Amino acid sequence: MKLKLSNITSSCKHLLLACTLLSIAPNTYAAVTWNTINPHVQFLKQQDKLRFYDSNQVLIEGEKCALLVDTSANFAAVEQLAEDLKKRLKTPLCYLVATHYHDDHLLGMAVMQNFYPDAKLVVHQQVNKNFSLYQTAYTDKLDTYEKSIELSYQRLANVPKEEQPKWRDKLKLAKKRLFRWQEYQLSKPEIVINSRKIIDLGGFEVTLEPQQAHTNGDLTITTNNGSVLIGGDIVDWLPYPGHGELKSWQTLLKQYINDEKLTIIIPGHGGTLTKEQLKQPLSFLTAITEHVKNNKDQSIEQLMLSFPESVIEPYKQEALNIKSSNFFLQAGLNRAKSAE
């Protein structure tokens, strides 16, 4: 009996989705690049094609302790990073800092906590307040993976016979990883930040500050006497405003732009920035709030069409930026409109 091409294509796509979700594709983790900012700070930059879907990490190490900022949403990548740290670190990993609650920054901490149970999770007080929601989000994500694997097994018969052994092996590995991740749990924070806090890693200090900008529970980290800022998604060149505190976010960006000490800015997504480059996200966020304020009677669709072209133009240099900027703009307009 001949299979319809559409059925085969659909089955292959679903199998690919299941395996992608469980990070089976080869070289997924290898594309993350390690960049030395200074002898104490390593910037783990996510590959460009995933820059709007997965996060960067930052490793900071003093003479007595190390601190990791954020984790990937790719649990297999987090496991690989945990293994790599065993080879790289000269000191214990004492702290795990989540810059905010979004999945691609927080949920992978469950994996890291399993490998480094003595490391203390550090979060904003607002994240701590709602932490049970994020623990549920971790289990929900695994439930989604499990359903995808089950459906993929059901559709395996529709895949060409010569392709089946390959996909069966991939799904077997996916199931093995899933069972392992189901044994992990996102453990409660041990350090909750509600005001400026300095952590001494041993001859090297980091300063953590609570913010309300990209979300209502952000953390920023500065090092090297304020010259290096690890700003999470607050300082992304193309920022996602859908959960943002837009006015205070703009104020904070202005503060960074005018900070004479600041020389290196590490975002949650994309490459390092200069203070001059921060003017673009500031312009984007400011235009969103002003556009909504000045056109209160317009629908979101109308606001999208009438949004200043000069502000959005820098984001139209490549397809991924265009797609993401349109989605982010819509989310920002909705956020600003709800705040009016």
Question: Could you tell me what each predicted segment is?
Answer:
Residues 2-16:
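Bacterial N-terminal signal peptides that target proteins for export
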Residues 34-86, 219-233:
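Conserved beta-strand hairpin/beta-sheet module of binuclear metal-dependent hydrolase folds
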Residues 69-72, 94-102, 122-125, 210-211, ...:
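Active-site neighborhood of phospho(di)ester-bond hydrolases with catalytic His/Asp-centered motifs
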Residues 87-191, 198, 287-290:
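Active-site HxH/HxHxD metal-binding segment of metal-dependent hydrolases
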Residues 205-259:
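Active-site-proximal loop/helix segments of hydrolase catalytic cores
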Residues 247-301:
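Divalent-metal (often Zn2+) His-rich catalytic cores of metallo-beta-lactamase-fold enzymes
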Residues 294-340:
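C-terminal regulatory/interaction regions
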